[in-house]
Amino acid sequence: GAWNGRLGCGCGGIAPAAELAASYGGGLGVASASAIPPVGLGVASENAYEGCVEVAGNLPFLGTAGVEGVFPTAGAGVINYGCGNGALGITAERGYGAGIGYEGLGLGYGAGIGYKGYGLGGCGCGCGRL
């Protein structure tokens, strides 16, 4: 089901985005309108792993995975990767507000208000009051 998806860890197939071919495994085409081709981002590891290994995290934009080296004659090597829901873009860039007050109890621009950090506009203490 949706809660025990492809990764077998109880969170693999959450959301319909996991079904998009460009978002989960397979080849990812790269198109550029620039005169200079994209160079990309590289993440390298020179560690030896034995047994099952699961790595999770976030990388900016699209990602690919590759394996180089010698595999033993017994066993297998597989890379499964996911890279979001296929909808790429920067949705917002915001600066940090100026917090003015004694030990964080003051009014900050665009941030929380007053004692215990009750917030405005979706920013708050997480206590469920606002």
From Swiss-Prot:
Region of interest (Central domain), ranges: 23-93
UniProt keyword list: Repeat
Descriptive protein name: Chorion class B protein PC10
Cysteine disulfide partners in this protein: none
Region of interest: Right arm (Gly-rich tandem repeats): 94-130
InterPro entries referenced in this protein's UniProt entry, alphabetically: Chorion
Function: This protein is one of many from the eggshell of the silk moth.
The keyword Repeat is annotated on this UniProt entry: yes
Keyword Repeat: yes
One Gene Ontology CC term in the entry: egg chorion
Region (Left arm): 1-22
GO term, biological process aspect, one: chorion-containing eggshell formation
GO molecular function: structural constituent of egg chorion
Similarity comment: family membership: Belongs to the chorion protein family.
Pfam short name (any one): Chorion_1
Superkingdom classification of source: Eukaryota
